A protein has these predicted regions:
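Flexible, active-site-proximal loop/turn residues at the rims of small-molecule/cofactor binding pockets
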Residues: 17, 85, 197
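Short beta-strand segments
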Residues: 12, 44, 80, 145-148
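C-terminal beta-strand-rich structural cap/linker in extracellular carbohydrate-active enzymes
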Residues: 177-199
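Noncatalytic carbohydrate-binding groove/subsite architecture in carbohydrate-active enzymes
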Residues: 1-64, 74
Length: 199
């Protein structure tokens, strides 16, 4: 294609795999596009949804949130969750088709939106397997989202330039409900921290 001057605006692909494999796919797509001279072509995962069979559970919420957190620092240009429809579909993972109430994964999108609204990504160091974290800030208003996609609780050690002024938990029973900051992040859960950053 490149030899014949055929343009490639974007390359799209799907993934219903776990987070580590989806990140490998994203890296491979970018690597191959660059290798063959399509460095300006966008790469998009235009369908993703981890473990669809778990929809409506705290585990699915943790996996969905963890995927978004991981994708933020991947070579992807865009990604589309499949899907958010309200109705009968095995892929419809944000709303219960029987009650119209949001499934837990919906609240992971709300948490990610709070990161987006802050506007500036902050550095986060997280080297624990199956745990994903992302932070953002706007002036002195900081927000940290941590997803534990593993089967065990993980001790929590947070060092921030400021003070934690709020904590919320997302799991199978708590839908971003206020909580005390725990000593460990429960298995299959998402923890959200609001931070007052020191000037």
């Amino acid at each position: 294609m490149k030899e014949n001057g055929v343009p490639l605006d974007y390359f799209s692909w799907h993934s219903y795999a776990n987070i580590p494999n989806t990140m490998k796919f994203a890296a491979y797509a970018r690597e191959q596009l660059d290798k063959y001279g399509f460095t300006d072509a966008e790469t998009t995962c235009n369908e993703w949804n981890p473990e669809v069979s778990l929809r409506g559970t705290g585990r699915h919420a943790a996996l969905t949130t963890g995927m978004m957190l991981a994708m933020q620092n991947s070579p992807l240009d865009s990604a589309m969750f499949y899907d958010a429809r309200y109705g009968t579909s095995i892929y419809g993972s944000l709303f219960n088709p029987l009650t119209a109430e949001p499934f837990p994964a919906y609240y992971g999108f709300l948490a990610f939106n709070e990161l987006y609204k802050r506007g500036t990504q902050a550095e986060v160091v997280c080297d624990v397997q199956n745990v994903y974290a992302l932070a953002a800030y706007n002036g002195t208003d900081g927000y940290l989202v941590i997803a534990n996609t593993g089967a065990d609780a993980v001790p929590l050690k947070i060092e921030v330039n400021g003070n934690v002024i709020g904590c919320q938990l997302l799991d199978g029973e708590h839908l971003l409900e206020a909580c005390e900051q725990p000593d460990a992040i429960p298995a299959n859960s998402v923890l959200v921290l609001r931070i007052q950053i020191e000037a």
